[in-house]
């Protein structure tokens, strides 16, 4: 049985902690110095004990971290350690901060993780062109798979999707690479955003596209927003995803997820036909969609400007020019709104609706199309006038 901090110890530490903090929740370095120096350890050792116990690196010790520091000091004095350990033993890690320790170990290369697989750029038949954008139909399917496999905390483990892996024509090495990509902290489970991205990568790989090498920064940040359980009585689960079998069936498979959902009894599942742009979705995916729409509008505006430049030799129509300027101003305003949305300012900070932004963009798109139609009609009128002038010249 691993050692543990006894209840009597905790009570002793609490009396010291509460006396030093005057009922506060944190102990500063100045408040802790007299207690720690009474141990007789060297200053450099005490500095390392502090760094080891300050798991969240906020420069203070809460009560759990103070217990860790005191226990390490007592173990040093009792000869359990020859020197300050470089890492905390697992039994001494506060469960409420275990995720921070695991993330730190992942960043320093000390955590278990799937073997990194070299990119196989010469794999026959694989295509470039992976796109992070999820169509409404694909996202609906991903969410269905997520709902069938999430645990009570809304997270999904690697092993929970084993039946799905078996239904795909994707090698296990690529499956593990995709998991590593969306799980930078090497956790045993991933949240909803990471799960949807993981399924999206597998879908593209199933369709013959290469696994991407990096994840957009905005998505990577959403992967790390995992929900933490603070119930210390919960039994600890396995911290690492189990390595899948190295031999995955690679024969001809059904379309991504269909065979798997059929086995789950969901073959009759149909979407309501509602576009996801009208539903409340996660901010990161909404940003991708809005940026795509902005790019399409930019392309259309460029075509309109090009058409206007071609007809500058004739009589200038002031009405289309006025409409064009107004649309450009509206487009600049929408771009500013998108920047505010990304930075959490303005309407976004006050709870502004992403749906209203998407609706406004749709309105701009309709107006641009109307402007193009108007330009075409004016060009037809211009051509007619030119023909009449030529006919008049010939008649003379």
Swiss-Prot record:
Main location: membrane
Ligand binding (Ca(2+)): 54, 56, 58, 60, 65
Coiled-coil residue windows: 284-395
Membrane topology classification: Peripheral membrane protein
Matches recorded under Pfam families: EH (PF12763), End3 (PF12761)
Cellular compartment(s): Cell membrane; Endosome membrane; Cytoplasm, Cytoskeleton, Actin patch
CDD domains given in the database record: EH (cd00052)
Function recorded in the entry: Component of the PAN1 actin cytoskeleton-regulatory complex required for the internalization of endosomes during actin-coupled endocytosis. The complex links the site of endocytosis to the cell membrane-associated actin cytoskeleton. Mediates uptake of external molecules and vacuolar degradation of plasma membrane proteins. Plays a role in the proper organization of the cell membrane-associated actin cytoskeleton and promotes its destabilization.
Protein name: Actin cytoskeleton-regulatory complex protein end-3
